[in-house]
Amino acid sequence: MEVAARSAATQAPASSLTIRRVGVFLGAEVSGVDLSKPLDRETVDALSNAHAQHGVLVFPNQAISSEDLKRFGRYFGELSVHPFSTSSADSAELIVYDNKEGNPPAATDVWHTDETFREAPPMGTILCSKIVPEVGGNTAFASMTAVYEGLSDRWQRFLSGLEAVHDFKPFRSLFPTDRAGIEKMRKFEDKYPAVTHPVVTVHPVTGRKVLFVNPQFTLYIKGMAEDESRMILEMLYRKTLIHEYQYRHRWDANTVVFWDNRNVQHAALHDYYPQRRLMERVTVAGTRPIAAEPPADAKDLRRYLMPPLSEFRNRGTAQKRQLDL
């Protein structure tokens, strides 16, 4: 895989801003900026470009308020409200994660891209650590551009033009099973119906291709039998687990992490109970994912599933492809 050559540290246009890579495929640490204060346009533009190039930006030593966090998020777009997560009583845009009073956290995250059950998933997510456990509680990130580029040419061609259906399936367990709960869930289904996204998207800033399926919200690939779709998705999900494609962040208090939801997946490790972990989050609204290629038709699917006829001839057999297209 070709890796773009970048210097270990680059000076952004704002003279005091330094961006230092911390991972091969994603991740950079940003210094020389104080998020408790308003930022000028030059700094915002530099951070926006770094966000697209590195996928995950880490801002250490940022003792900021909730209002500071929201202001920082608004530099990059409108803040969205998560329909299922627990928001602050003071602001619907602010999500608070806190296992105070010894309450165990939920089970460890499934790898995912945030809120792909929306027609327009968020462009980015910003998380600020307030209280962190002494041990555990890391967050893992994976570059879905690196995952795509690591696939063989044949797999890349096959996936091109495919579409997958996404749904808010993990949140269905939040609804009670009584009549009132079922009615409430149906209202959410009307508001957030299953949506279709390209399996391979194009990042709107870098122009690089991205594998855009995830085990938390993706249901199936359109135009395939259930077992075929499941087999392909499970193979693609395993690619996310390749360590070289990942950046694993160990949290310190007062750290802000801003990741690109358009080409990065993440999973939080909930291995810190009974220690406390208090985090605040804002989410920056995005636009519909851009397809790398027009939707594929059935003939395209069959063509790439079968090996070329020359492979059979080279084996000295008259065997013919099942589908001669």
Give the location of each predicted region.
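Non-heme Fe(II) oxygenase catalytic core, chiefly the N-lobe of the double-stranded beta-helix
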Residues: 2-253, 261-325
